[in-house]
Amino acid sequence: MSWKCSSYEFDTRMPVIMGILNVTPDSFSDGGMHASADAAIEHALRMVEEGAHIIDVGGESTRPGAAPVAVEEELARTVEVVRALADQGICVSIDTRHAEVARACVEAGASVINDVSGFRDPAMVEVARACDAGLVVMHMKGEPATMQDDPVYDDVVNEVRDYLADQARMLEEAGVSRERICLDPGPGFGKTAKQTRELMLNLHELARLGYPLMVAVSRKSYLGVLYGIENPLERDDVSAEESLAAVELGASIVRTHNVARTAAALRNLRPYCFVALGCNVALVGNPGEEQEAKIAQLSQAIGDLSMLPDSQLIDVSSFYDTEPAYLEDQDRFVNAVALIRTGIGPHDLLAYLHAIENKYGRVRTVRNGPRTCDLDILDYQCYVCDDEKLTLPHPRLTERDFTVKPLLEIRPGHVLADGTPVTPDGVTLGWANKIERHA
């Protein structure tokens, strides 16, 4: 998946770092530090040297309780800084809620509009439609001055996900191309520390929407509550670790005050890996309950995946009822796809998967024949190989409905390590239907 931002295009299979440049006197952690144009530009260039791909310029504080800034004042703070950085070949983002500011900064060279109000203003939508900048659509309950006044949700994850999906759909219907849109769940914006924590632990649910996902937790107050760190300037280490955890769950754009510390943390990012699971031989089960027995076997195998060393189970698709492929004279399959993050190399991981298969009685006497448990590596982040033991990406992934459908369920728009997009267009066999299960 890529994120198109004017003349820039970012491959979101790897983290993209957005450095925060507040040209404000009252931001919650660095207000006044970069208020002059010279100081702001110097700090931006330092962040680029430290690894920032984008510089996010903000001229209005959106901290809880912040007073609004007049548009004229916000323009005076931001436009010349944006122009100076863009003239040096830097991808610049303008962090603003105001259409006049967004328009002026895009004209000055900004390649991203980062709107904390989520493009609720029709005038901002018109600015977005009329340009080719990348767009960051954020969720915020209320306005900065009042957003922390007792925010209430029935289900914070579902409500934020649905809001972001609706806003993205609205932008597309207004004429904005999908590849320009990035989503930001807005940690700490109209959310308690507990609500924000729940949201951040379930980012994989937002990644299922199929847009690049931003994580913007840097120095946020909820981290102060969770870790007992009162001074925002002392939250950089936990901010970096929280950002790393968010990227492992599916975020791809990291907005941060401390670029160097964040870049260092992201070097510990474990590769993602998609694992296909299949079964058409139930080991136990009463007549008529074979499908549930197959699901149970795959569920146990998924549990085994979650126990792999230096690994984390991130997401699992629904189960799919599948017609046999290649060898058609056999029982129907149940299939699924799991997404993991792992520090295990691909060839060693294959050995672990074979051990799980063997645990459930897998035999390999008939090619493409019946199996109690079948685990295949479909795609391993940034890794391409073709040797006697392993070929990656899986050479038959894109022709099989039973791998394409579940993979796209959990990561719409996924692009394989060799650059091949996963789409339904090349599917020719192994037709699959989602199994509807009710709690």
Question: Which residues does each predicted region cover?
Answer:
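Short beta-strand-to-loop capping motifs
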Residues: 279, 285, 338-344, 379-382
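Extreme N-terminal starter segment of soluble prokaryotic enzymes
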Residues: 1-3, 15-16, 271-274
